[in-house]
């Protein structure tokens, strides 16, 4: 992903698609990978320690394709102001996958209280507001351009501040409740 501002800014994809962009345990599965003849199946991922990306004064959350499925990756720095998701959805063909990929971006918009600009080569390109609503879009397999103004939102969502802590606490208290209720049933 390259942004042009005063300087050229580069972001390298950190989460690669298994068996699509890299082969897990490649050293052990080399023969299988070669037999399957999957193009681009041995790419290298970008570093987790990449410099921030800016467009003018706006701090960008760059997300490439499959990375949008990882909340923790997107939330690695909750000071970012705008999420940009680019994707090659041509892999999916005429399936429901481009719609599901868009829905994942809608969830991220809600989770992080951020607008998302989503640009795809064949999938659904869209502007998604911080409530997960698609404001403008270009349908699947359609060429086009989206223009508009995107507000920068300063406030953070609870999820962007605390991540999975709430879910983990709920799980913990549920387990404690199950253990305690099992203990009392055993001693009745």
Task: Annotate each predicted stretch with a short phrase.
Residues 161-186:
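Selective detector of the "anchor" transmembrane alpha-helix that sits immediately C-terminal
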